[in-house]
Amino acid sequence: MNRRLDNARTIRAPHGSDLSARSWLTEAPLRMLMNNLDPDVAERPEELVVYGGIGRAARDWESFDRILGALRDLGPEETLLVQSGKPVGVFRTHADAPRVLIANSNLVPNWANWQHFHELDRKGLMMYGQMTAGSWIYIGSQGIVQGTYETFVEAGRQHYGGDLAGRWILTGGLGGMGGAQPLAATMAGASMIAVECTPSRIEMRLRTRYLDRRADTLDEALAMLEAAKRDGKPVSIGLLGNAAEVFPELVRRGIRPDIVTDQTSAHDPVNGYLPAGWTLEHWAAMRERDPEAVALAAKRSMAGQVRAMLDFWRMGIPVLDYGNNIRAMAQEMGVADAFDFPGFVPAYIRPLFCRGIGPFRWAALSGDPEDIYRTDAKVKELIPDDPHLHHWLDMAREWIAFQGLPARICWVGLGQRHRLGLAFNEMVARGELSAPVVIGRDHLDSGSVASPNRETEAMRDGSDAVSDWPLLNALLNCASGATWVSLHHGGGVGMGYSQHAGMVIVADGTEAAAKRLERVLWNDPATGVMRHADAGYDIAIDCARENGLNLPGITG
């Protein structure tokens, strides 16, 4: 029996103010775990897969049920421990300790590879938590859309004078992360062709309004692109096809996109990337029969796609790796110059990280969209002098469809996050929100990840692979009073390539919550400033001094 497959279940988080657990501090992780598996949120909820290839919310359905049971029973001075999606212990701690501690997919470095992970996975001893799948703070494609938007806008500033009108972006992948790309592109003023091999993913992005059109052939997609250019309006097109075939074909035809990237699940060559020339049915059968052959065929196909991306790069077209480790896979297959084009963080995002700015997110546990709209207004009130942020919030309200529990993301940094958290808590206390909110972030943040091919690529001091930083981030968030804290391995880029930490904190309107919020939402982004200041970035050093951080040898 497959303990991970249950087509009979439909999971949706409870809404409203009635509790099924003993407090909001345990009701919150319960609802957010369930929300991760809402069919409007998750990629394959019947298999517990949230996004990112095989990124799961729980190890199997028995573990899922036991986690819910433990959360319902958990006391105010107890902490639940979760090991790779399985509840393993409840211990007496204290009221300000995290209610849940999560460790997902962590392996001793010498064994930190997909082969060993899959051996353990088959034995039922481990699961892949991705970043926010196994840490119960995934909010659908909105979770990455602003970061993608910021990246495209910055690329437009650097390469096209700040104007992407009439230009188009080529990419691959419309999964949980890649699905944000089409909306981010049109928000930034550009059109997009996003190549996706799975029809259901295209349909999901159309249904949730992240995508405008579907094309079944490259010629059809190009015709749609030309029509949009004539009309003067950006359009996003989901092209049913294989990026490994479409990218080289565009090179052969001499067709020039204006920006090229990729968000296929290349980090997982067995489950995440369709080899060139294969059907979906053959791929599924081969994954069961010979996963090693699948991985080899996928990596060879990735090499072909990266060669095409390098061809675009040599034409002078901006090309960026969007953090799925496709360059490393291609390099493994003999593409020696795979890293000639940059990753998106060193190219466009690092100055934000130096100031602790990253993907701050919150969700309304009530299920009421009005709670999000009220918090949107509060963000504008508290940060009145940031027109770019206000523009983002206006666009988000107009364009972004909520998936599951209503949620919002906006990139804010040190000195802003704790003020917002305290304000949201006060809104709950005054009854301006109909239930508490949870506040969290992606593991892709300034101080919470070590990933040499993504977030920490090309660090100034060469410390790309030093993973002490996310460990310190997790420890500090525990000490500061986060409601749940997670420590993962392999998210985004695959086994052996990253370690990262997450935190979530509940604003329930109490004085105790206010104290925790002030500590956590100051300390968490401050670790990002610390990490970048330690690496020698002047922006981070200045930010640390401006905010009075005590960094021995740097600010002292």
From Swiss-Prot:
Active-site feature positions: C410
Q: What is its EC number?
A: 4.2.1.49
* Listed name of the protein: Urocanate hydratase
Cofactor requirements of the protein: NAD(+)
Where does the chain bind NAD(+)? 52-53, 130, 176-178, 196, 201, 242-243, 263-267, 273-274, 322, 492
Record's catalysed reaction(s): 4-imidazolone-5-propanoate = trans-urocanate + H2O
Q: What's the name of its gene?
A: hutU
The subcellular location is: Cytoplasm
